[in-house]
């Protein structure tokens, strides 16, 4: 499909996921919403269509290029907490809120209770962040914080022929997302004139 068709498909998906019943509950609960995975060459407008969809649907958009992040900014920073188990005191590791999830909550506080969480270059992450991204797509969480209800996950990546650092997703992950393959639209291009 081309980028225009992808935009319409994603817009349709967002609209369906945000429909509510008479009691104000989402008709498709968060647990049943499959993240959208948009795969296509760089520079075809994947990020731009997310901005357009958010504007047209009058919802928020939080966009991150995940290759600029570390495991700590995605999952949160570790800290030690004392807890008691079976009458004995233990030091355990907990995590602060993910920078990405915190950005969604900031957007909610700004008046956008619904929106799109867009993660770009999801299949180009470092080796240490790859398991976190798989967990994100499968469980809709970063660390121990879930994506809030009303926020739709859309991720984008590039095929391996465009980026040598691409990591392939396993079949289990691909089974849990709605994958769209987008090709460059050559409608407005013409061969360059030769002298």
Locate each region found by the language model.
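Conserved small/polar residues in nucleotide/adenosyl-binding loops
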Residues: 188-195
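A short helix-turn-beta junction within AAA+ P-loop NTPase domains corresponding to the substrate/partner-engaging
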Residues: 167-184
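Pre-Walker A (pre-P-loop) alpha-helix and adjacent loop at the N terminus of AAA/AAA+ ATPase modules
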Residues: 2-34
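AAA+/SF3 P-loop NTPase mechanochemical coupling elements
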Residues: 95-96, 105-107, 112, 143-158, ...
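Conserved alpha-helical scaffold flanking the Walker A/P-loop in AAA+ ATPase domains
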Residues: 84-116
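AAA+/P-loop NTPase substrate/partner-engagement loops
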Residues: 59-83
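Conserved catalytic/switch belt of AAA+ P-loop NTPases
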Residues: 128-146
């Amino acid at each position: 499909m081309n980028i225009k068709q992808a935009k319409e498909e994603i817009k349709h998906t967002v609209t369906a996921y945000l429909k509510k019943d008479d009691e104000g509950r989402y008709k498709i609960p968060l647990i049943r919403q499959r993240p959208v995975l948009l795969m296509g060459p760089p520079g075809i407008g994947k990020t731009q269509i997310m901005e357009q969809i958010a504007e047209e649907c009058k919802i928020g958009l939080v966009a991150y290029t995940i290759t600029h992040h570390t495991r700590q900014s995605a999952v949160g920073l570790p800290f030690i907490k004392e807890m008691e188990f079976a009458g004995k005191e233990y030091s355990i590791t907990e995590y602060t809120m993910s920078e990405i999830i915190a950005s969604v909550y900031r957007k909610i506080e700004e008046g956008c209770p619904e929106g799109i969480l867009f993660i770009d270059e999801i299949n180009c992450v470092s080796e240490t962040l790859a398991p976190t991204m798989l967990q994100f797509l499968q469980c809709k969480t970063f660390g121990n914080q879930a994506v809030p209800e009303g926020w739709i996950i859309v991720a984008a990546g590039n095929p391996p022929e465009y980026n040598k650092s691409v990591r392939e997703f396993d079949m289990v992950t691909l089974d849990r997302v709605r994958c769209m393959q987008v090709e460059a639209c050559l409608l407005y291009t013409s061969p360059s004139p030769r002298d």
